[in-house]
C-alpha cells in the first residue's frame, strides 16, 4: 500500500499497525535512531527504517506465539512466556533468543511492499537502537523474572 496509508494505520493503532495479509506488525521508526540502525541492520530491513517504518513478523522467535502490542507500555509483549520487545521489535526481556524477526521491505514511489517470502532473523539480544523504555505498565505480568 501507500506509505502515507501505512503511517496513518500505525497512528490509528496507537503506534502499532497490524497488516493481516502480511502477518506483520508495522511501526514508525524514528529518523533520529538511523545512525545506530545503520550499524545493526542490513538491507532490505534498513530500507524500511530509512523510510520511517519497521516491519516485524507477528510470531515470537521463542516458540512462535503471536505477539500482541501493549498500548500501556508501548512495547510488544508475548503472552505465552513473557518475552518483551520495544516498539521496533528489539528484545527487552524474556526467554526469546533475539528480537522479533523481520521481513524485507521495499518503498518505491510512495508504495510499500512487504516481502513475506524474505524472513530475516531479528536483532541480537542487547540491540536497542531507539533507546525506548517502557512507557507505562506492562500487559504481561512476571516478565522481569525471565531476563
Residue locations for each model-derived region?
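N-terminal pre-ligand scaffold of iron-sulfur
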Residues: 1-61, 65-70, 103-147
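Short cysteine/histidine-rich zinc-coordinating motifs and their immediately flanking basic loops
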Residues: 70-76, 89-93
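Short proline/glycine-enriched turn/loop segments at secondary-structure junctions
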Residues: 91-97, 103-104
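Extracellular/periplasmic metallocenter environments
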Residues: 59, 63, 77-88, 99
Amino acid at each position: 500500500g501507500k506509505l502515507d496509508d501505512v503511517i496513518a494505520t500505525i497512528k490509528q493503532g496507537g503506534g502499532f499497525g497490524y497488516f493481516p495479509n502480511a502477518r506483520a506488525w508495522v511501526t514508525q521508526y524514528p529518523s533520529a535512531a538511523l545512525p545506530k540502525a545503520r550499524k545493526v541492520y542490513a538491507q532490505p530491513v534498513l530500507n524500511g527504517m530509512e523510510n520511517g517504518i519497521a516491519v516485524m513478523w507477528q510470531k515470537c522467535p521463542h516458540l512462535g506465539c503471536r505477539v500482541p502490542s501493549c498500548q500501556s507500555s508501548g512495547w510488544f509483549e508475548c503472552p505465552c512466556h513473557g518475552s518483551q520487545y520495544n516498539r521496533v521489535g528489539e528484545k527487552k526481556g524474556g526467554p526469546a533468543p533475539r528480537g522479533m524477526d523481520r521481513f524485507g521491505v521495499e518503498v518505491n514511489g510512495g508504495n510499500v511492499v512487504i516481502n513475506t517470502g524474505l524472513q530475516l532473523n531479528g536483532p541480537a539480544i542487547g540491540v536497542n537502537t531507539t533507546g525506548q523504555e517502557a512507557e507505562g505498565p506492562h500487559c504481561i505480568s512476571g516478565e522481569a523474572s525471565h531476563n
